[in-house]
Amino acid sequence: MTRSLVWGASLLAIALVLPNASALAHGFAGQRFFPATIATDDPFVSDELSAPTVSTIRNSGEGGGQEIDTSIDVSKRITPNFGLGFAETWQHFSNAPSGFGNLELSAKYQLLVDAPHEALLAVGVDAEVGGTGARKVGADRFSTVTPTLFFGKGMGDLPDSMKWLKPLAVTGTLGFGFPTRASTVTDPDSGDVERHSNTFETGLAIEYNLQYLQSSVQDIGLPAPFNRMIPLVEFAFSTPFNRGQNGLTTGTINPGVAWAGRYFQLTAEAIIPANNRSGRNVGGVVQLHFFLDDIFPTTIGRPIFQ
C-alpha cells in the first residue's frame, strides 16, 4: 500500500471510531443553512446531486482556446454520518481534442454538528483515479489521494449589537495531496522527467445568507427571489511543497451568488485567476444542485443504514 493510501485509510479509521455527530440533511447546523459550494467542498454529509456544473474559460498561453467543462457530482449517505461520492467531467476544447477527465471518488465522515454555535466539522478523503480519463485531454496516468478536513461556522451566536453580521458564515477545507507517482518520464529518448509534487490544498468560502437575515435576524422586506439569495466568494488554492516546486501556488477567486430553494439550489460564480501562474483570463461557472434528501426523503434520499 502506498504512503498516500495509508494516510487516507488511517484518517477514515480515526473518524469511524469517534462518537457520532447529530447529522442533518444538506448542511444545517441549528438555524444555519450552509449552501453547496462549487470551488470548495462542503463541510457536511448529505444525499445530493450536482448536475450539471458547467464552467468556461479561455486557456492562457500560445494558441490558448476556449475550454468548457461539464461535470456531474453525486453524494450518497451510507449512514447518517458517513457518505461516499463520485464525480466525472467532460472537457471540451475549441482547438484540441475533447474527452473525459479522471474519475474522482470521495468519502466523508461528519465529526461535529453544533447547533447552538452553528458549527460543522467533517473529515474525508478525495481520490482522483489515474488512468480513468482520456490521454488526449491530459488526464494523469497516476492517482492523487487527498485527506481533507472540512469546517463551517455561522455567526448567529454573535451579540445582538452585531446583528447585521449574524447572516455571515465561513466554510473551508485543509488538505494534503499525495500523488501515487513521484515522477513521469515524458520523453524516453531525452530522458525528460515531469515531477509530481505533494500539495497543500486550501479552500475558503465567505457567505452572507439573506434568508437567514430575514428569518433569524430582522425581516427587512426582501421580495422573491432576493429573499433566498446567498452572496458569496470562494478562494481555492493549491501549493506544492517539494520536488522542485516549493511555494508555486495556483488558485482562483470565485465571487458569485447562490439561490437556495427547498429542493434545489442554483449558483453562478466568476472564475478569477489568483496570480499569473493560474492564468490571465476570467471565466465563469454555473451549477444546478439537487437536495435528494428533501426530494426523496423515504427512498434514495435517506441513509442506507439508519
Predicted features by range, described:
Residues 24-306:
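Transmembrane beta-barrel domains of Gram-negative outer membranes and organellar outer membranes
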